[in-house]
Amino acid sequence: MEIETWPIDKVIPYDTNPRVCPEKAVAKVAESLRTYGWRQPIVVDTEGVIIAGHTRRKAAELLGLKTVPVHVAHDMDPDDVRAYRIADNRVAEETRGDKDL
């Protein structure tokens, strides 16, 4: 997977993103970025619109970052992008935390 560094303002939120990013979640992701660094890039289409990673982008903004790591999904057509957005959000909905960890 090729990862590029982009100015944060070139990474465009998807205007009909189905997932709401609560401030609490953004703060937790920001803390994770501060502690562990970037372990997952933001995935964008060839126009720079976010496919996956809205919360990571908001966390980067909260931290005042000027650049973010990005993977451009050159191999995905619009139907693939739509399907991936849906799948990525559904997987998150189907998971839960293990309080014993």
PLM feature spans:
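Short, charged/polar connector segments at secondary-structure boundaries
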Residues: 1-101
